[in-house]
Each structure stands twice: as C-alpha cells, then as structure tokens.
Amino acid sequence: MDSDSINPKPISSVDEDYRPPLPPRPSTNATDPGSLQGQATTAITPVEIQTLSFPDGSRGTFSTPGPDSIPSPAESGGASPNRHDSSTSAEVDETASLMSFAPTMRPAGDIASLLAGELHKKSPAWKMLRTQSASVLPFEKGRIGADDRFVEFYREFDPLPEEYDEDAEEDVLRLWKSKLKHYLILSSAGKPIWSRYGDLSLINSSMGVVQTIISFYEGAKNPLQGFSAGDTRFVILTKGPLYFVAISKLGESDSQIQAQLDALYMQILSTLTLPRLTHIFANRPSTDLRKPLEGTEGLLSSLADTFTKGSSSALLGSLECLRLRKSQRHAINNTFLKLRAEKLLYGLIVAGGKLVSVIRPRRHSLHPSDLQLIFNMLFESDGIKGGGGENWIPICLPAFNNKGYLYMYVSFFDGTSGEQASSPAAAQGRSSDEEIAMILVSPDRESFFELKQMRDNVAQQLAKNGTLAIIQNATRVGRPKIHEIAPGSQVSHFLYKSRANVQFCMASLEPHFTGLVSRRRLMTTYHELHASIHAKHSHLKVLHGVGDDATSLAWTTPVFEFYCVAGPNVSRATITQGANKIIQWAKREEERLFIIGGGVF
C-alpha cells in the first residue's frame, strides 16, 4: 500500500480545495416520540386577547402571554424557554429562537405585545374602525332582526277578527295573547266595561278570573296592586267601583303603568263626571256601564294606543310646546287677551299636538293631565279631527273640577287664512302635525255664539299680522335636530323637561326613530332610565347605561330632567359632553321652548 495513503499529508494553508469532514448525523431514534415537544415554540407563542377601555373612552385590543407562555431570559437563565433538555448542541440550535431573547419580552400578565414600541401608534385601519364604530346608531342591531319582543311590534295594533266561528276561536284567542299590551276595565261586580282588544265574549272568562283575584285580596284588607307571571306584568288600579287592569310585556314600571291607568280613569270621568259615576253604582252595583260610555270607546282606544306606542308626555307628566320666539308668542297672547270674550275661562291655540299659547284666570291653571285628554280628543281620535270645522263639546276636566262640566268650543284653521277647515288635514294632503286649532273653554253652556265670535276675531287678527303663518311655518320645521343644536355630538335623541314649567322638549324623531318599532325601542330605553332614577329609595342624580344596542344617560336636578340615547360604542365621556351641550342650549332657548306664565287675566 502506498505510504501516502497511510500517512496523510499535513494540510497546507495554500490548499483551498480541502473541506473538513461533517460531524455524524444524529440518529432518528435519539428522541423518543413520546417526549417530543407538545408546547408551541417561542416563535409561535400561545397568547390571550384582552380588550381594554381607556379613560378617554377609546378601546384597544392587545395580545397578552398565555398561562403557558414564555418567561423572560432572566428567569430562564439565558436558555431557550419551553424546550426540552437535549444532549447535543445541534438540538439547542434548532429549538431556540431569536425571539426568545428579544428585549420586548414581558412577564406573564403584563399587557404588551412583541411590538411594544408600536403600542400607542394607531394605524389608519384602526382609526377607520374607530370612526365607523362611533357611527353605529342605537338599536341598529335590533333593526337587523334580533330575536326579541319588538320584532313583531308593527303588528301590535292589528285588529282581531270581529266575526269568527267556534273552530277559529282558539286562533283568535292566541292572537289576543300575542299582544304586548292589554288594558281592561271592569266593575267591582265583575261586569266587563271595556277592553282594548277582543270582544267581551272572547275575554269574559279572563275578566272573571281577574275580578276574583282582586276581590280575594280586597276581602283580606290588602288591595292587590300588581303581580308577575313570567315576563308579563299585571298592574291593577282600583277607583271606587271600577277596576283598571294593564297587562304589559314592555318592561314598564308599576308607577308608569298606574299613571296610564289613571289617565284612562280620567277619560271616563271626562264623559260622566265623578258624581254621576258614583250615583250609577250606588243604586245598582251590577250596572252595565257600557251604555253610558257608548261612543267613547274610540277615545279610550286612542289613549291606550298612545301609551303602547310610547308617549313622552305621559312618561314625564308634562306638555310639549311649539318652539317660537318670545316676541311672537307675546304677540299671540296679547291678541288673545285683547279680544277675550267675557265668559271665557281658558283659551288655547294648539298646533300638531303642541301648545302654542294659553290664556287663563290669574288663580287658575290647566293641569297637564287635563290637556292630555283634550289633545287626545283633538289629534289622536277620529271623532273631532275627522269632522273638521267647529265643534261644541261638554267635557269634564277632572284635575280642574271632577264634579261638573265645562263647555269647549273647538275650531280648526284652514291654512293661514284663518278660515275654518271644512275637512281634516289628511283629506287636504297635509300632515296632521300641521293642524292648527283654537280651543275656547267656558263654564256657560249658552256661550257658543259668543265664543264663536271671539274665534273669528282672533283668527282674523292673527292672519292679518302674519302670526298664523309663523305658527304654520314652525309646525313644518318641526322639532330641533341634534346636529343643529349640538354640532359634532354623538347623541342620537334626547328629552329635556323643565320642572318649574312642567313642560318638555325633545329632539326630532327623524330620520332614525320614525318607524313604529324603532320608536318603541327608544321609548323603552327612556322608560327604563326614568324608572331607575325615580325608583323608591333611589338617590341617583346621574345614571349612565350601557347595553348591546345603545348607550344612555339620565340626569336629574331640581331644575330639569334630562334623558338621552346614543350608539352602543359611544363612551361615557362623549355622551356626557354631548348632554352638556344640549342642556346649555335648552337653558339659552328656554323662553322659546317653553311657555312661561302665559297670558293672565
């Protein structure tokens, strides 16, 4: 054998083609499969996602180390975390990661990302997301079709079939039970008087059960005021020989529902007066009151429907006035006072259900509940409004005097000419919100012609000086819009009540709350705020509510009550800032928004 093959030559520095031999390849059986790494490597670290709300109202989403995440290099002694012991340095090189020793690592629980230096830098995509999330409107989730109680609310006022055979009775009864709100009136003897839905033959048995329950508690000297069955609330109001019952699935408080039942009682008294009602049942406790109340069913139904749809006036116990300049309202009052008839008790001008002007005796004022009855009669029911022209109506105003009648002259205006309307506004192609009426109240039943002459004189003067056109223009403008009174505010709607004047103003329902369902959602939120802040033993002055579909705020002081609603992503700081702007606006515009004093004689 050649000696050169036995004794290799030493490696010369000039021999550049020589390469050292590779180390032996690790055996594939060096690592038992059962001991293979089951955790993620440090390059793919298990993380948890956390969302934080910052003091400025913004929100951020961050990755935080999971429970099995890597420790810091100091804790691991410089070794690669989460790796198994290996007998070779090659395995160390394969399992270690440069990210294991990155200076951005934090102990578990510290809220940071691997890119800690970029934490406070907001990307364009993030800014766009923030802009879009702030523009989400209240109840937008509900409008998409959430499975809740209001999905079928648009069918709430569909009438039940009046004629049906015995086979269809179960279906009709099922329709009756599907309604979210019921009102029942019956006598203490169990005689049915009125029901909002269904004929009395359909619900006679239900009324009998209700009467039995109420009588049982009255016999125990513990009058029943309400009880619950699942998500349904039963509220009872006893007024002498009459029982008023409300069955509600709308989430209203007992005090709110009792106020509604009391309004129905006032509606009955406005027709019968208290002495006559008492006399009827004193002689015959089992009297059927349907005959004396014949013709007023429409008034009761329209009032009940107003409550079911959601009435801001009923909720706040106050009136809404038409927004006018102080000088313009002053001119209307002066015209009223100058042409006042001798037998006049109250004089009012009303436009679209809002009070424009009122003149009254110095020591008398009209209660909001009485005006609510008048407005319901004029603008909600089809009786007077459908007739147009002029009307002479005997009426009892229970809050003023529940023992006798007053006589009310009502005349609707035809445009700005001051002439009497020959037909309702709808027949003339005008909105009912543009209807203008004059109401003159007298205690003298023989004062019709005197009040008619006063109406003609006042209408002629208002048309002559252009005030009637100003009133009509104000009704067309409608309620104030948020972007006009608080530019940049993210508040979507508000209610503001002046406690001293017992009057309120509200934002326009357009464009987001004009629908029946969206308006009911809005009013339900207001009912919840009102119930919470006025709850018995509650000392809340400011209440901030956060839900999946809306953010809300209630604020009460001795001077005002304020309620507002915004989108679900609006922060507390943002909605409070918007509320402050609106309240400051209301204080500046107080003499335009509210009637302060009115005309007094």
Curated annotation (Swiss-Prot):
Membrane protein topology class? Peripheral membrane protein
Keyword terms, alphabetized: Autophagy, Endosome, Membrane, Protein transport, Transport, Vacuole
Q: Where is this region: Disordered?
A: 1-93
Biased-composition ranges, Polar residues, are: 27-53
In terms of Pfam families, this protein maps to: Fuz_longin_1 (PF19036), Fuz_longin_2 (PF19037), Fuz_longin_3 (PF19038)
Q: Which GO terms describe its cellular component?
A: fungal-type vacuole membrane; Mon1-Ccz1 complex; multivesicular body membrane
Q: Which InterPro entries match?
A: FUZ/MON1/HPS1_longin_1, FUZ/MON1/HPS1_longin_2, FUZ/MON1/HPS1_longin_3, Mon1
Keyword Transport appears in the UniProt entry: yes
Its GO biological process annotations read:
autophagy; protein targeting to vacuole; vesicle-mediated transport
Q: Where in the cell is it found?
A: Endosome, Multivesicular body membrane; Prevacuolar compartment membrane; Vacuole membrane
By its UniProt entry, which PANTHER family does this protein fall under? SAND PROTEIN-RELATED, VACUOLAR FUSION PROTEIN MON1 HOMOLOG
Indicate the family of this protein.
Belongs to the MON1/SAND family.
Q: What does this protein do?
A: In complex with CCZ1, is required for multiple vacuole delivery pathways including the cytoplasm to vacuole transport (Cvt), autophagy, pexophagy and endocytosis. The MON1-CCZ1 complex acts at the fusion of vesicles with the vacuole, through its regulation of the SNARE complex during the coordinated priming and docking stages of fusion, and particularly at the stage of tethering/docking.
Query: Under which name does UniProt file this protein?
Result: Vacuolar fusion protein MON1
Q: Which organism is it from?
A: Gibberella zeae (strain ATCC MYA-4620 / CBS 123657 / FGSC 9075 / NRRL 31084 / PH-1)
